[in-house]
Structures are given as structure tokens and as C-alpha cells.
């Protein structure tokens, strides 16, 4: 179930349906452990909804837990 929630988050995000993406992401967060992909989605959604503290928290987790991931590299590129 948690994988399906993350997939739906990503699909809605790609469709620019950010409100639904946020809803799926919230449900995902309640049921699953974070991975690099979910943290990067969390950063992007938090930025869209101007939740700076949340974006920073997800970014820090991404940096500390998945520093070699493609998602962390994408985060670094987006911060430039």
C-alpha cells in the first residue's frame, strides 16, 4: 500500500496536481519509512506550499541518509 501511495504522489506531482499529491504524500508518511525518492518529493511539495521548515527537514534527511543518491544530486542542482 505505501508503494502505491508514493506512486500516486509522484503521478499527481508530474501532472501538477499538487493538492492531491500532498494528500497522497501525507498518507504515505503515516505508513512508510522514507527513502530518497520520497524525501525529494517531500522537498518539492513543501517548496510548492511554501513550507520552508518542512522542506529544510526533508533536505537534511536526504543529505544525511542518502548523500550519494540521484535525488540528493537533483536537490543540489535545484538549490543553485
Regions found by a protein language model. Name each.
Residues 7, 41-44:
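"A position-specific structural signal for the A-helix of alpha-solenoid helical repeats
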Amino acid at each position: 500500500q505505501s508503494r502505491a501511495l508514493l506512486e500516486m504522489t509522484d503521478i499527481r506531482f508530474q501532472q501538477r496536481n499538487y493538492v492531491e499529491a500532498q494528500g497522497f504524500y501525507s498518507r504515505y508518511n503515516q505508513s512508510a519509512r522514507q527513502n530518497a525518492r520520497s524525501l525529494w518529493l517531500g522537498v518539492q511539495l513543501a517548496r510548492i506550499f511554501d513550507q520552508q521548515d518542512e522542506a529544510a527537514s526533508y533536505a537534511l534527511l536526504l543529505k544525511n541518509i542518502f548523500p550519494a543518491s540521484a535525488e540528493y544530486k537533483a536537490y543540489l542542482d535545484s538549490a543553485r
